A protein has these predicted regions:
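Alpha-helical promoter-recognition and RNA polymerase-docking modules of transcription initiation factors
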Residues: 1-110
Length: 110
């Protein structure tokens, strides 16, 4: 997904809705079979959480570069998480990846 500005990102992301746990499991099964559409659907359902994370950051971090870092963190979290196990919640895994992204972005910018 391509964004022209941070406002464009917020606007496009606001149209996505969160999935239920059952829908996540169905997408996970489809992902296991190799479906990239299911992966994209999972990623899109968590973009509003990423947008909320970005909004809570200082002004110097609210730019498209940081959006890209956060999108990569979301993709990494989706790829590494086993939705079929109930060991931890995906939100916990995603928030961990986003905090790592904050640190990485700050280190690379200064």
């Amino acid at each position: 997904m391509i964004f022209i500005s941070i406002e464009d990102f917020y606007e496009k992301v606001s149209s996505f809705s969160k999935m239920s746990r059952q829908e996540e499991k169905e997408c996970a099964l489809q992902m296991k079979e190799g479906s990239t559409a299911a992966r994209e659907k999972l990623i899109q359902s968590y973009l509003p959480m990423v947008a909320a994370h970005i909004r809570r950051r200082p002004a110097y971090m609210q730019n498209l570069g940081f959006v890209l870092y956060c999108q990569q963190a979301l993709e990494k979290a989706v790829d590494s998480f086993n939705f079929l196990q109930d060991s931890e919640t995906f939100v916990h895994r995603l928030s961990w990846h986003l905090r790592q992204t904050d640190t990485k972005y700050i280190a690379n910018c200064r």
